[in-house]
Amino acid sequence: MDKNLLEAVKFDEKGLVCAIAQDAETKRILMVAWMNAEALQKTVETGFAHYYSRSRQKQWMKGEESGHTQKVRALRLDCDGDAIVMLIAQNGGIACHTGRESCFYKVWRGSAWETADAVLKDEKEIYGSTH
């Protein structure tokens, strides 16, 4: 592990840090996930976003099933060291497992959440079944 890479990062009690994927061109927030030290190291080594799945309890590379990989252009660490923003180039234009550009596709309209973004590709087409 690269000590310089990891020493400024404040991982939580579970060994995780919040990781935000932001489109390098449009600056749109695409998704929020978690990284452990190994996922962060793998991200730096490969140039592609790797995360840690809390539900599956394992590291994974974004796009390993869907092909919608995230090429990392830059990493930014916040002032407290407990959140990372990755400026990325999103392969295929789809970051969300629902087939949308962004996981942030719902907008509050005063009294209800409304879907604001269209599905670009059906989940069944991406994964073979619903994810």
Swiss-Prot record:
Pathway as given in its UniProt record: Amino-acid biosynthesis; L-histidine biosynthesis; L-histidine from 5-phospho-alpha-D-ribose 1-diphosphate: step 3/9
GO CC list: cytoplasm
Subcellular location: Cytoplasm
Protein's GO biological process: L-histidine biosynthetic process
Cofactor: how bound: Binds 1 Mg(2+) ion per subunit. Binds 1 zinc ion per subunit.
Entry EC number(s): 3.5.4.19
GO molecular function, one term: phosphoribosyl-AMP cyclohydrolase activity
InterPro entries reported for this sequence: PRA-CH (IPR026660), PRib_AMP_CycHydrolase_dom (IPR002496), PRib_AMP_CycHydrolase_sf (IPR038019)
Protein name, as recorded: Phosphoribosyl-AMP cyclohydrolase
Entry binding sites for Zn(2+): C79, C96, C103
Any one Pfam family match given in the protein's UniProt record, by short name: PRA-CH
UniProt-annotated binding residues for Mg(2+): D78, D80, D82
NCBIfam families: PRK00051.1
Co-factor requirement: Mg(2+); Zn(2+)
Catalytic activity: 1-(5-phospho-beta-D-ribosyl)-5'-AMP + H2O = 1-(5-phospho-beta-D-ribosyl)-5-[(5-phospho-beta-D-ribosylamino)methylideneamino]imidazole-4-carboxamide
Organism: Neisseria meningitidis serogroup B (strain ATCC BAA-335 / MC58)
